[in-house]
Design a protein with these regions (language model features):
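Charged interaction scaffolds used for protein-protein
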Residues: 1-170
Length: 170
């Protein structure tokens, strides 16, 4: 009986949500490196970890680790100002200095209510500053947008937009 294990092979295969979950893993908190990598497989959608352990050979673990070697190198240095999700184009606000008070308060509130750390706060920030072209800010949409971005944006897209944050204004 053949089993399939979901393994990303490039940063573009890793969603924002998966990246957030990966950032919570501390290799030192695991009994072995194998346990650590098995936990990583769970994050990538391999729900039946006990079944996986039954058929994966030690040599397979080495192959799995090699396939995920891309994680040892940073994602490509992209410069994204917009992304397309499910056929809809979302664009970053053009100038961070032009955030409205309502937008700023929404970001702060989402971060405080969720007790989010710097990585976990990325979807909250994006839910306010990454909008469909021409759309005005609507605080009623932020929770749905956070989930959309966590599940549909690759971490490569997100990090590509981080260039925008590092210079503040375009």
């Amino acid at each position: 009986m053949s089993k399939e294990i979901l393994i990303p092979t490039a940063w573009e295969d890793v969603t924002l949500n998966e990246f957030i979950e990966l950032s919570k893993l501390d290799i030192d908190s695991f009994d072995s490196h194998i346990d650590y990598y098995i936990s990583m497989l769970g994050i990538f959608g391999n729900d039946d970890l006990n079944n996986i352990l039954e058929f994966v050979k030690l040599t397979d673990v080495a192959d799995i680790i090699n396939q995920m070697a891309f994680m040892n190198t940073p994602p490509k240095n992209l410069d994204h100002k917009e992304v397309t999700i499910k056929g809809e184009v979302f664009k970053l606000i053009e100038n961070m200095n032009e955030l409205t008070v309502g937008e700023y308060i929404s970001i702060e509130t989402l971060i405080e209510q969720g007790k989010l750390d710097s990585i976990s706060s990325i979807p909250a920030i994006l839910s306010v500053i990454l909008k469909p072209i021409g759309e005005k800010f609507d605080s009623n949409l932020v929770n749905a947008r956070m989930e959309l971005f966590k599940n549909e944006l690759s971490i490569e897209d997100v990090l590509g937009m981080s260039v925008f944050f590092s210079i503040g204004v375009r």
